[in-house]
């Protein structure tokens, strides 16, 4: 009965092997994350007498190569939520945290939870690619929001409220009409220096070039906004700044669109795709996000397990004669999954479907 605790970090891990009653089989030692070192570690653990179980914390992407190599070598591997390790056996007033201490702590956890450890199973390539793609999508969306806010701030000096002139939906390639417009008409004087008719003709050609619908009323609205704009004088520097910001925003927006399309393509290969997409409030954007965060739903033993994974189960708050009425959610699980669920519920609440069972039960 060999309990292997592995404290994983970037590029290396600390390994400790223990047996019941505090017997130390192998003192904590360091292993680099190279193919040869991980292979040697697997062989060393397989050579131990008795059954061997390996436990390591889920640490982003760092633990995945280690878990895969050890599992592929035929060892029992369990990947545990770091919260469980953090809350385990904190019976000392000293708060010592080193890689060696953590490895020993994980090994003791392995011994204590021996019969309840869940075996690690590598994700299939499609689910892994979907989750990685979603992570990059999140990063790109955050950068796009930052660049968009920066551009709007710069427009306050050259063409105030130009971003509010258009309400066209985003194209499939990520392009937005107001961003394309600002790329060519970066200053209010680019419009106001012309007559209304001259601008209308120029705007018509611009719409035809970029594939947008032209209306004379919209042309007159843009012209009136430009004439009444209070902006700084035109300068080559202002033009450079605006056009470079537009180019950056377009590039990131195209990346966001590409990630979204790839996520949809990958999610269509999963068996639960049709079921998820039939859910009200879930579309081609939120559906793949939901599937990416939940992963293989078959790994959950019950719906309560899935609720706990999302961190939305109620948190009891009772003590003695005091009964807590405000039992908020635990928020221990995936924050990204909770955000996705929040967006889905926002869609449901905004559209208010009359035949939704949620509203039928509430009304009853």
Segments from the language model and where they lie:
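A detector of single, family-specific signature residues
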Residues: 1-361
